[in-house]
């Protein structure tokens, strides 16, 4: 089970500092900041969206997981969650619970599960029809 409360790691602190340096540039559209991650990066995607929901217009965690109680803080971020139902590395139930928690919080969330797909659900996710069109059409609410 994922922890409910976690201090921000030094790596994530550095990542946020890097992100902030880009956000300070005038040519960056601050209404179109997206985050995508797979496996442990999917967990990081959830974590960053939870910690800094004001930054992201959309998040795409692929085969990640998170403690669902933490997700209420990210309800203003649009989510598209992908997972394979045969994943034996990161349990699919984590994505299912995340979807239900986001839905209950009133988030704009979509969940796509790939039957028979193992841990490499990023392959069908990145090939999902309209993947990039959906992402690039998202703007902060």
What name fits each language-model region?
Residues 2-8, 86-88, 121:
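Second-shell loop/turn segments in exported
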Residues 2-40, 55:
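Gly/Ser-rich "nucleophile elbow"/oxyanion-hole loop immediately N-terminal to the catalytic nucleophile
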Residues 35-37, 62, 82:
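Short beta-strand immediately N-terminal to the catalytic nucleophile in serine-hydrolase-like folds
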Residues 18, 46, 63-72, 93, ...:
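Alpha-helical scaffolding within the catalytic cores
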Residues 42-53:
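Short glycine-enriched nucleophile-adjacent loop
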Residues 54-65:
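A conserved short beta-strand
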């Amino acid at each position: 089970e994922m922890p409910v409360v976690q201090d921000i790691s030094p790596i994530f602190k550095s990542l946020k500092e890097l992100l902030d340096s880009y956000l300070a540039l005038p040519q960056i559209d601050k209404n179109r900041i997206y985050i995508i991650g797979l496996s442990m990066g999917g967990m990081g995607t959830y974590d960053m969206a939870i910690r800094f929901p004001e930054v992201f217009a959309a998040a795409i965690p692929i085969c990640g997981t998170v403690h669902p109680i933490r997700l209420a803080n990210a309800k203003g971020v649009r989510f598209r969650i992908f997972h394979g139902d045969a994943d034996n590395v990161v349990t699919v139930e984590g994505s299912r619970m995340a979807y239900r928690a986001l839905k209950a919080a009133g988030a704009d969330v979509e969940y796509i599960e790939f039957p028979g797909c193992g841990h490499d659900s990023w392959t069908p996710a990145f090939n999902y029809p309209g993947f990039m069109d959906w992402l690039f059409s998202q703007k902060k609410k």
